[in-house]
């Protein structure tokens, strides 16, 4: 039996981990790649905490700023101590804080593997290693048998023991071993205080990045919220949306459930509020009605504030829309209701964003066709007391004015070229906003895999990282080829999703397609592997690359690229 492999969160050195396809289970902890083990171990424990504190008083960017290997400037000069145990771990140059983090990782790997003995004078590290040996390692080893046993019990109609849900790479080793009937979070406690702190930090970094890119304060963002990710994180997306509009949840101190919200005054916020339009998934709609009502009430309350338009564009916009709707004949209550809609999703009972069939079946001519599908599928308004009212015009009005599309990724167990959901929601919103507003909005794909250090990246940057770090990485290709038919399918699916991002956003550059072409078509080893193990996957990949050329999404450097691909279509290369 196999289980889907994982892409762990980025380790502190900033490397993008790769996965080798489906992993055979069970595996000892030592047999896992260090990147996977490191991500399981980093939160919430550090193998060097205590003996070499994770927050040294030396080595930071300034005398007053401590060095934290989980949240530091990797390119900054290292000004701290150079212990002999770290000097001997690598012959590589030691100049930056990133070099220091890399040495700490290498030492941690050797300690976990038992290749380096843990000094007696490091009691805290010895405690952590004992915890790994007594709890984490057995939990990982138990996963395979537990999943097989639970599957057979479920098929036989017998009891499957319950267990918590979450991402083990985000500080939740208690979800191991897998194979249990997992239960979710208490939705009344979402967003959690921890999620709000992450959401607040991410919101501030997002605003800072926008100001750096555009030289002005942002006014309106479009944000996607998925149910599964918010279950794993305790509500990162909801928390970020609340932080952007300048609102903080209020929790009951006993139950830790959310009981309301607090509007942060401009003097404390120290920046303008940002108008946020939420595009929720169908599962989010079903699982988090309290959070829908919370955000709806909060943004309407912010819209009623008597604040300057420069501080509160939400209120300025709502006042203007109410006046316009009243002039068109609506009563004040109806006008206020429509002007306050900020949460949209698919109609009740429906799921997805509506783009997958168009992409798969080539049922579109222009990007406007994809935008239309996104608008038709997601133009139903939700809120407190509102459960999917058709409001196409209001949805269009919201998307017409958004300046940035925001998508958060809560873990590194997958990437944006692993799933069709990212291009459908993120790409669909971008296509619709471009079609309605006449200009392509900025697109930010944020990394929340390490709660202590959220990272804001543009979609172009994220696609570049994934293409270089995973898609055309020889280590990933060698690993995926070990799995025959399914490995070839994964390669073709990755090319599909890359093409879909090019179609919806234009964020895929020629060199991205060129790298894929060189890795999967020009490389005879990979081409022959796909032809032998999964000819259908090779055909699908070839057709997708030819479609990219035909639609002018990719202009190959080589004049022979089309000929090579068409030769495959005639079976010449497949038979060679």
Task: Report each predicted region and the residues it spans.
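Glycine-biased, low-complexity coil/linker segments
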Residues: 20-21, 50-51
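Extended, structured, electrostatic nucleic-acid-contact surfaces
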Residues: 35-46
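Ligand/cofactor-recognition surfaces for anionic moieties
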Residues: 1-2, 63-576
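Short, tandemly repeated low-complexity microdomains enriched for cysteine and small residues
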Residues: 23-33, 54-62
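Short, exposed "boundary/linker" segments that immediately precede the start
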Residues: 3-10
């Amino acid at each position: 039996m196999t289980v889907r492999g994982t892409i762990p969160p980025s380790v502190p050195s900033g490397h993008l981990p790769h996965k080798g396809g489906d992993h055979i289970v069970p595996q000892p902890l030592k047999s896992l790649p260090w990147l996977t083990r490191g991500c399981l171990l980093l939160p919430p424990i550090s193998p060097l905490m205590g003996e070499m504190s994770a927050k040294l008083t030396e080595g930071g960017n300034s005398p007053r700023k401590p060095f934290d290997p989980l949240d530091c400037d990797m390119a900054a000069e290292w000004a701290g101590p150079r212990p002999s145990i770290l000097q001997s771990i690598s012959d590589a140059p030691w100049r930056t804080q990133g070099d220091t983090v890399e040495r700490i990782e290498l030492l941690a790997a050797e300690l976990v593997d038992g290749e380096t003995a843990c000094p007696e004078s490091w009691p805290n590290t010895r405690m952590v290693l004992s915890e790994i040996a007594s709890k984490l390692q057995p939990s990982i080893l138990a996963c395979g048998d537990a999943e097989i046993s639970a599957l057979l019990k479920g098929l036989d109609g017998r009891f499957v023991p319950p267990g918590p849900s979450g991402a083990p790479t985000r500080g939740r080793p208690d979800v191991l071993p897998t194979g249990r009937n997992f239960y979710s979070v208490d939705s009344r406690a979402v967003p959690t205080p921890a999620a709000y702190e992450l959401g607040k930090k991410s919101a501030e970094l997002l605003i800072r990045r926008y100001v750096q890119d555009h030289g002005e304060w942002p006014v309106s963002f479009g944000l996607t919220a998925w149910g599964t990710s918010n279950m794993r994180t305790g509500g990162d997306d909801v928390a970020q949306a609340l932080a952007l509009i300048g609102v903080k949840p209020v929790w009951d101190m006993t139950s830790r459930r959310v009981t309301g919200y607090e509007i942060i005054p401009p003097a404390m916020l120290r920046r303008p509020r940002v108008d946020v339009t939420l595009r929720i998934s169908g599962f989010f709609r079903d699982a988090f009605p309290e959070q829908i009502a919370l955000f709806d009430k909060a943004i309407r309350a912010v819209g009623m504030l008597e604040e300057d338009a420069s501080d509160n564009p939400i209120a300025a916009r709502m006042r203007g829309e109410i006046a316009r709707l009243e002039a068109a004949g609506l009563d004040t209550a109806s006008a206020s209701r429509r002007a306050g809609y900020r949460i949209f999703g698919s109609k009740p009972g429906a799921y997805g964003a509506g783009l997958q069939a168009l992409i798969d079946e080539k049922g579109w001519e222009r990007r406007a066709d994809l935008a239309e599908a996104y608008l038709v599928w997601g133009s139903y308004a939700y809120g407190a007391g509102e459960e999917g009212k058709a409001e196409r015009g209001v949805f269009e009005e919201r998307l017409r004015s958004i300046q940035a599309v925001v998508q958060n990724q809560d873990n590194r167990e997958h990437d944006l070229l692993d799933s069709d959901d990212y291009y459908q929601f993120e790409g669909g919103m971008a296509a619709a906003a471009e079609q309605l507003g006449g200009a392509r909005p900025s697109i930010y794909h944020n990394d929340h895999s390490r709660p202590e250090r959220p990272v804001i990246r543009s979609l172009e940057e994220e696609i570049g990282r994934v293409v270089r770090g995973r898609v055309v990485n020889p280590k990933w290709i060698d690993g995926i080829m070990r799995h025959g038919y399914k490995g070839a399918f994964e390669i073709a699916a990755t090319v599909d999703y890359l093409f879909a991002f090019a179609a919806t956003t234009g964020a895929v550059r020629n060199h991205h397609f060129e790298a894929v072409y060189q890795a999967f078509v020009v490389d005879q080893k990979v081409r022959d592997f796909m032809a032998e193990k999964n000819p259908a996957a090779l055909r699908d990949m070839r057709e997708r690359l030819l479609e990219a050329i035909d639609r002018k999404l990719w202009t190959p450097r080589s004049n022979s690229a089309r000929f090579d691909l068409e030769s495959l279509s005639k079976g010449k290369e497949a038979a060679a």
